[in-house]
């Protein structure tokens, strides 16, 4: 299970540049082969610590999902018998969902959300709890034909095979709902549109992961009946709420 290499793997490939430092004290590098290497801070290193050993085990389980259609899981864990150094995976490019271009057309956005929801369903049925999933960990890349939407920073995704799959699915869908609504229509909670009982009911169902956020957005578009000769964009929707 999982792929593990020692630190010589990084030394042999070589580091091209430092990409950034995270607020958790980790450092992100781009390697000479184009991959991303996340080097963990000292807090994660010591494998005599049971919490760090569990963290490494979870990361190794994630490598079994490398190549997932939506989620950018690591390919390799860099470790020794005593130390956990970091993880290597694909360097994903794109714009965080929170900073999505408001001129993107709604039809395109809904297509992306459909793909995202299918990926969430797939990974939830396998028993994954996608902790720390939020609007800054979802990347949009309209230029890419193969990976226009990706979930990154999966360190705290946890495989929970003992959990009910429907419960996991709804938990993960609640996170997706929060990320999308926060990014696309953050003002909806203050809007008069939720005074419509039918809209409010659909909103509550979607916010609890009972129905898909894409279905809620399509229902919302149906209810507000936006009239425009131009392609409908996120900005148009925001102004109509």
Located regions from the model:
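Hydrophobic transmembrane helix bundles of membrane-integrated enzymes that assemble
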Residues: 29, 115-116, 138, 148, ...
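Amphipathic alpha-helical segments that line or abut small-molecule/effector binding pockets
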Residues: 106-125
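A short, low-complexity linker immediately N-terminal to eukaryotic Hanks-type protein kinase catalytic domains
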Residues: 1-16
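ATP-binding glycine-rich loop module of kinase domains
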Residues: 12-73, 77, 100-102
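Conserved structural core of kinase catalytic domains
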Residues: 69-112
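Catalytic-loop of the protein kinase fold
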Residues: 120-142
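C-lobe/activation-segment region of protein kinase-like
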Residues: 143-241
């Amino acid at each position: 299970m999982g792929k593990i290499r020692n630190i010589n793997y990084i030394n042999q490939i070589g580091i091209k540049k430092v990409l950034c430092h995270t607020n958790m004290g980790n450092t992100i590098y781009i390697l000479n082969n184009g991959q991303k290497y996340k080097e963990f801070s000292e807090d994660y290193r010591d494998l005599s610590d049971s919490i760090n050993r569990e963290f490494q085990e979870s990361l190794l389980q994630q490598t079994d999902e490398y190549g997932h259609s939506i989620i950018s899981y690591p390919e390799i864990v860099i470790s020794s018998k005593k130390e956990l150094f970091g993880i290597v995976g694909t360097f994903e490019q794109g714009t965080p969902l929170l900073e999505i271009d408001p001129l993107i057309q709604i039809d395109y956005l809904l297509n992306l959300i459909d793909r995202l929801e299918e990926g969430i369903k797939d990974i939830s049925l396998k028993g994954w709890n996608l902790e720390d999933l939020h609007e800054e960990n979802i990347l949009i890349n309209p230029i890419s034909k193969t990976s226009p939407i990706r979930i990154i920073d999966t360190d705290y995704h946890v495989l929970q095979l003992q959990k009910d799959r429907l419960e996991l699915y709804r938990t993960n869908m609640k996170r997706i709902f929060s990320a999308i609504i926060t990014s696309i229509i953050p003002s909806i909670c203050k809007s008069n549109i939720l005074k419509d009982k039918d809209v409010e009911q659909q909103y509550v169902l979607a916010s609890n992961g009972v129905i898909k956020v894409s279905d809620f957005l399509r229902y919302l578009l149906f209810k507000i009946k936006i009239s425009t000769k131009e392609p409908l964009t996120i900005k148009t929707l925001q102004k109509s709420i």
